[in-house]
From Swiss-Prot:
It is found in: Cytoplasm. This is Peptide chain release factor 2. The modification N5-methylglutamine is found at residue 251. Its main location: cytoplasm. Keywords: Cytoplasm, Methylation, Protein biosynthesis. Methylated by PrmC. Methylation increases the termination efficiency of RF2.
Amino acid sequence: MDNYTYSELLKSLQNKCDNIALIIKPEKIKQELERIEKEQEDPNFWQDVLKARDTNKEKVRLNRLLETYQKTKNSLDESVELFELAQNDNDETTLSLLYEEAPTLEHSVQKVEIEIMLSGENDASNAIITIQPGAGGTESQDWASILYRMYLRWAERRGFKSEILDYQDGEEAGIKGVAFIIKGENAYGYLKNENGVHRLVRISPFDANAKRHTSFASVQISPELDDDIDIEIDEKDVRYDYYRASGAGGQHVNKTESAVRITHFPTGIVVQCQNDRSQHKNKASALKMLKSKLYELELEKQQSSAKNEEKSEIGWGHQIRSYVLAPYQQVKDARSNIAYSNVEAILDGDIDAILEGVLIAKA
């Protein structure tokens, strides 16, 4: 990097920071935080528990956004000042240090941009994830289990919690399907763009001839809805099936028909849960999954209508990302059009760069 390149980078980052300020309006955030603090001082604040909870959530979000913005702006202003002084004094040591820190400065501005992008209605929610293997038997079932582990490892890296709702072992390896919740700040906001088909190309560990195989798995993401969001489901539109649990989460198998499957006829959505020994609890969890999927479906329809587009199909034709392990190693996302070479780390849950790249591409 040279003086001109760094100077242009600073101009670009300053422009982005100015645009961010126009969007988030820091002074208005400060005023809103003052208003919330006064509201919290009211002795009657906790009488409406749901409202109080939402207010606290908003306070945390605004504080985090303001703190991230101010920290980034201060770092940028300091870098601009140091750069001018170093240029005037021909201070090569300081210039070299600034060049080295440029990627960190650039990433900090990007972090504020991501914070803004995660301010949607459901972005702060927990995420319900369903993974289904495509055609191909053991190959696809194994690929589905690899994706499942990838998301669990991502959650662990962030300190998020996870909870299995439904898990079906594959016949030889992998899984026939899994549904689980990732619980953490902005879990849905980060993962919402994972909806679609994930493609794997590799030398099959199940093929004695060591041939290259292509496998597919479908990932569906929906927000875990708060209890105060009411989604009405007509009983005549659904069918409940009860069966004996099997696989992980259902080690008490073949004793009681505690597992629950719900089919929603108007949409064709099928959800199932076998995580708990209690049929009642499994039914409640399955209903929560169904309501979340119906809510997500309605949001997609509204967004498509607003853009005057047809609803994008989340099916086997909607491929969002390819993971190639042979003959070369590369993960490429179809939305951001960015390719990544750290395939092993990605499959171990290091997917922040991919998720953020898609958020920025779709902004």
